[in-house]
């Protein structure tokens, strides 16, 4: 078995005291599973890809936010024009007297879901701070380190203020069209989603919404929802003893045979083979 790839501090931080660094991924390519000697925030700007975090797959796209601990294992697969920022930091180097743990701990939502979403307003504010942080963090003098840490604090507070978890039944509250749609899709893993009803409810034109969604994510709305459901099915196949028919129902598929066809088309193997590969309990 190959040894685990570990990303080292020395390869990313210019000095032993530098607290935070911005690593842009324009684009993020396929990247093998790895851990780190540091922690990171991952914020996705556009495109899509498969982010596998601690063996759980997530189809990620614009607005997705992850708090990654040093010991977390993750990789990027099946990327499509995926653009993101990694804000990497060393907790032991942070000097400001604030509750960093509360701001940066890996928070979990319903069912332990570590994925958060950032509202459109939050993305605009975060982008402005990250641009400043990217300019300041490479400087090696003490004042620059202090300013970089202050900007990092501002970013952490911005993320905390504007994040939400649609899978937990919450949404962005008052938000722009794409925020509302993402929240609705996140709450539709096991129930049908009616785009026409959604547009009527929020008085939104359907065609421009479809175009906006594809422009921002690189997918159609139905493709994205299908990917969310398949990722959920992969997780349940590995970590539960539910029958495959029960998993199909929990992932929005009324017909288990159709579920098997879609799952096989998306992953290359049948649900049963997927479960066997991971040594999960048989359905």
Curated annotation (Swiss-Prot):
Pfam families: AraC_binding, HTH_18. It is found in: Cytoplasm. Its main location: cytoplasm. GO terms for molecular function: DNA-binding transcription factor activity; sequence-specific DNA binding. InterPro entries: AraC-bd, Homeodomain-like_sf, HTH-like, HTH_AraC, HTH_AraC-typ_CS, RhaR_RhaS-like_N, RmlC-like_jellyroll, Tscrpt_act_RhaR. Residues 196-217, 244-267 bind DNA. GO terms for biological process: positive regulation of DNA-templated transcription; rhamnose metabolic process. SMART domains: HTH_ARAC (SM00342). GO terms for cellular component: cytoplasm. The record marks 246 as: Interaction with sigma-70. Residues 179-277 form the HTH araC/xylS-type domain. Keywords: Activator, Cytoplasm, DNA-binding, Repeat, Rhamnose metabolism, Transcription, Transcription regulation. Binds DNA as a dimer. Activates expression of the rhaSR operon in response to L-rhamnose. This is HTH-type transcriptional activator RhaR.
């Amino acid at each position: 078995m190959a040894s685990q790839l570990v990303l080292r501090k020395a390869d990313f931080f210019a000095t032993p005291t530098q607290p935070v660094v911005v690593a842009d991924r324009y684009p993020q390519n396929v990247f093998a599973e790895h851990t780190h000697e540091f922690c990171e925030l991952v914020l996705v700007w556009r495109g899509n890809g498969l982010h596998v975090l601690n063996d759980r797959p997530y189809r990620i796209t614009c607005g997705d936010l992850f708090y990654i601990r040093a010991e977390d294992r993750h990789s990027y697969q099946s990327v499509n024009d995926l653009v993101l920022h990694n804000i990497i930091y060393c907790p032991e180097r942070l000097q400001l007297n604030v509750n960093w743990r509360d701001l940066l701990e890996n928070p979990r939502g319903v069912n332990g879901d570590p994925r958060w979403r950032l509202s459109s307003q939050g993305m605009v504010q975060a982008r402005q701070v990250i641009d400043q942080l990217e300019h300041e963090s490479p400087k090696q003098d003490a004042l620059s380190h202090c300013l970089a840490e202050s900007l990092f604090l501002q970013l952490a507070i911005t993320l905390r203020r504007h994040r939400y978890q649609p899978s937990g039944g919450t949404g962005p509250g008052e938000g722009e069209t794409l925020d509302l749609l993402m929240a609705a899709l996140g709450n539709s893993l096991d129930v049908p989603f009616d785009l026409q009803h959604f547009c009527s409810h929020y008085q939104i034109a359907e065609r421009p919404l479809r175009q906006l969604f594809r422009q921002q994510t690189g997918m159609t709305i139905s493709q994205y929802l299908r990917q969310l459901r398949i990722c959920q099915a992969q997780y349940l196949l590995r970590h539960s003893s539910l029958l495959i028919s029960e998993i199909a129902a929990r992932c929005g598929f009324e017909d288990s045979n159709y579920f098997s066809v879609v799952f096989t088309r998306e992953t290359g193997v049948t649900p049963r083979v997927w479960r066997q590969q991971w040594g999960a309990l048989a359905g």
